[in-house]
Amino acid sequence: NFHIITMLRNLKVPHKSSEIFSVILPIFKVSMNLAHIKCLSMLLGALCAVQTVCLSKLAGAFDSKASRESCFRRIQRFMSQMVLDLDAVAGYLKSRIPSDGPYTLTMDRTNWKFGEVNINALVLGIAYDHMSFPILFRLLPKRGNSNCKERINIMQRFIRLFGRDSIKCLVADREFVGNEWFKWLNDNAIQYHIRIRDNFWVEDPRTNRNIRAQHIFANLKHGEERVLYRIYRICGELCYLSGAVIKDKTGKPEPQILVSFCRPEEALPAYKERWTIETMFKVLKSSGFNIEDTHMVHINRIEQLFGVVIIAYTWA
């Protein structure tokens, strides 16, 4: 992937901690002391240099004349004492986007496992220039899918920080469906384009007839698209439908069916932005920062580390 390769090349450019310090000082000076901000700036520079969360490797890349062992202990103390203001992190991340919006938001979830500990992150990003900036995230203390309350909470937090008018639309994959979720989006007039499973039941409110979504687009061939301007009822909510036939990961044709609050003609082009969040996950994980290397098991500390890695990701 061209965009992953470009980002990884940028990450390898050395970043002086003094330069990083001058940028992050105004953002964190209210919630962190100067010693912690300085340590954070050196940690960010080391992350960009070695692209791993392995503390011993980060200590070796610290912008400090102290010994590697001393730097290692300093990082350990910092990670145990640090309380990262995640609202401030979100404001900083948004400031890195050279656009005032409104934005296409991408919602997705990523997970990994260390020993018996399941680490499960719900992430809300802003799609811009073939990238997704991970503005907000929450580590879920469980395995499996997010629920409606967790999705609503992260959306409400975005609205509290940046306003509803900053949202152009939300795009998300098949996990992010449900009656209560669609109702909340509709009630708040948030434009969305969300993929549904092919076997979803769709009701035509004019006839009260139920039909599987895949049957509506059954005669489409690979590369063809269709936008339906009739309103349907899905998960109890009135929505629009659009569809296309794409190739899955194995190269086999499959339907891609989207449900929208309004403007269904924008659904298929907008949904292509969803792939930016998957690219971002690759950079955070095995293709870039190797966040899966963390040996932390306490969810609060992992959440803090996740925030630090996300800052380093956007610094590039």
Place the predicted regions along the sequence by residue.
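Single, function-defining residue in the core of a domain
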Residues: 2-54, 64, 82, 89-90, ...
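TOPRIM metal-binding catalytic domain and adjacent DNA-binding surface shared by DnaG-type primases
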Residues: 45-49, 61-73, 78
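Short alpha-helical "recognition helix" segments of helix-turn-helix
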Residues: 58
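Active-site-proximal, Lys/Arg-enriched surface segment
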Residues: 68, 72-130
